[in-house]
Each structure stands twice: as structure tokens, then as C-alpha cells.
Amino acid sequence: MKYTTIVFDCDGTLLNTATDLANAVNHVLRTHNFPEKSLAEVKAALGNAVTYLMRQCLPSTVADHELEPYIEEFKAYYGEHLKDTTAPYPGILDMLDELREQGYKLAIVSNKIQEGVTPLNKEYFGDRLPVAIGERPGLQRKPAPDMVLQALKELNSPPEESIYVGDSEVDVATAENSGLLCIGVTWGFREESLHQELGVTHIAQKADDILSIIETLNK
């Protein structure tokens, strides 16, 4: 088997978290009498961790050095509401079960804070994804390779045997920086045209496509 390990992004790839994230953003904005953001506006800012998300959604009158209290408010609210509407995308659980049955090693690597990744992984995926890396001290977040390489270390897998699956430009860059082949998915927070523009050659339009792409790659 040429590829033995599949590493997944979380938000926009495995889980549709957009509404819960948007609700948390808008809770902070409402609290401070700032204009709220649409779901589309929040989705466009997702993928690059919470500091970037809040920078994009807060007014420019809030200086960069003033962001931290708003970030903490977001984290507190989201921590209590991260499972209100979140759910796996169609076919994801069956796809993960099939990969696991075929003997693939599986992991999540996400720019979501570790305090979000851990409970969501446990709630929705059980033991399907034994390694789940979120934003934490000591690891540079995506698109730096650190988080992916940490996951591969825990799985005892080399990059050349591993595939990264994600929905955004951050994921494409992460795969490249980590030395992994990339599969782009079109059901998340970005359009299919983005993957085409970035030169992604393996694009999944539904969860089953991930299985068929991997099967073809391993022939």
C-alpha cells in the first residue's frame, strides 16, 4: 500500500461547524453593539484559527492589540455552544469506517483550539480518529507543517505515505508545506474553483469520492 495514513481537516471537511461558529462570533459582536456578520462572511474568515477569525469580523476600530478580550469571549461562548447545530457532513462517518476497516491510520489536524477539537472528536467520531491535533502552545498552526508532523509522529507514519484532506487554501498550503499529497473537498467553506486555481488535482465532491481517489492512488 503506497498510502497508509489519512489526515483530515475538521471544520468544513469532517464537520459542518459554520453556524455554531457564526453564532459565537455574533454573540461577541452583539455584546459590544458591533454590526453582526452573515453566515457567508463568517465562513469566508474560517480556516486560519480564532485570532484571524475575530480580526476579520471585528470592526477596524478595534486595534490588533485589543483583540484578546474578544477572543476570550468567543472561546467562552463557543465552548458552551459548539454542538448546538454542528454535525458531520453526509457520508463522513461511513467513509471513516471504511477507511479504518481497510487498515488506514486516521487523524484530525485543525486550526480550531484543542479545547474545541477534543470534545467534538469524541462526540461525533468516537474512536475513529485516535489522533486529534488542534491549536495548542508549542505548535505553529497551519499552514506551517508542525501540527501535521506531530500527528504523523503519533501515528508513526512518514509524510510520503500520508494524504491531507481539507476544504480551504490553508489546507492546500498545509499539505504542500508538510510534504503530503492533498485531496480537496468541495462541500466545506470554499468553492471548488479555489482548488482548481491552486492546482489541486484530486478533488472530492462527496465523501465517497475520498475512498475512490485513495483506492486509485494505491493501485
Locate each region found by the language model.
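N-terminal helical cap/lid subdomain that shapes the substrate entry/recognition surface
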Residues: K2-D94, Q102, T118
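Conserved phosphate-coupling serine/threonine residues in phosphotransfer and NTP-handling enzymes
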Residues: T13, S110-K112
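Substrate-recognition "cap/lid" segment bordering the active-site pocket of phosphatases
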Residues: D84-A87, I113-I163, E169-S178, E192-Q196
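Surface-exposed amphipathic alpha-helices with a cationic face
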Residues: L93-R100, V172-E176
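Nucleotide-sugar donor-binding loop of glycosyltransferases
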Residues: T186
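Short acidic-hydrophobic, aromatic-tinged amphipathic segments that line or gate anion-handling sites
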Residues: H202-K206
